[in-house]
Amino acid sequence: MKAHPDKANYASSSPAFTITTELLKLKTGMPGTMIPYKGSGEMILSVIQGQTAMTIADGPPTVPQVKAGKVKALAVTGAERSPLLPDVPSMTEAGFPSVDVHLWSGVFATTGTPPAVVATLRKALNQSIDDPGVSAKLKAMAVDPGGATPDQFEHIIEGDITKFADVVKTANLKFED
């Protein structure tokens, strides 16, 4: 991308992917203009078809395309390699330890939801995640079946807000409400 900055662009479908790519740009000096897409599948397809130069995307739509040889994975975000792509280095191994980003999904309830209801929902969710069949299916889709208490999850969210605030400011990113 540095060799042809006039053609440097990247696909993104969410603030998470945009912020992660902008972090990579800030740490490497790489140029690139964001091209918006509606979803991860469209992002990967845009790279396969040569419409965009690169993307940072989640595992479910990406891993099958990498394994099929339709796109080349240069690195996985984070400090460790993915067990689904053991030959692909981590960002840390590639020389960018500060591009340690882990995407997560969460389950939210309305503010003021009674603690007993939250506990019931959490118990049911954890039972599903702990089911070996569900866990194996999630892992096969490149989804890490984690789990956190509401307090731990709040800490994760607050940490990410702190971690990425400078990226959003420096890259002058604007997101719709």
Regions found by a protein language model. Give the residues of each.
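Structured helix-beta-strand junction loops
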Residues: A3-K7, G50-Q51, A68-K70, A94, ...
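C-terminal lobe and pocket-closing loops
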Residues: T62-D131, T162, E176
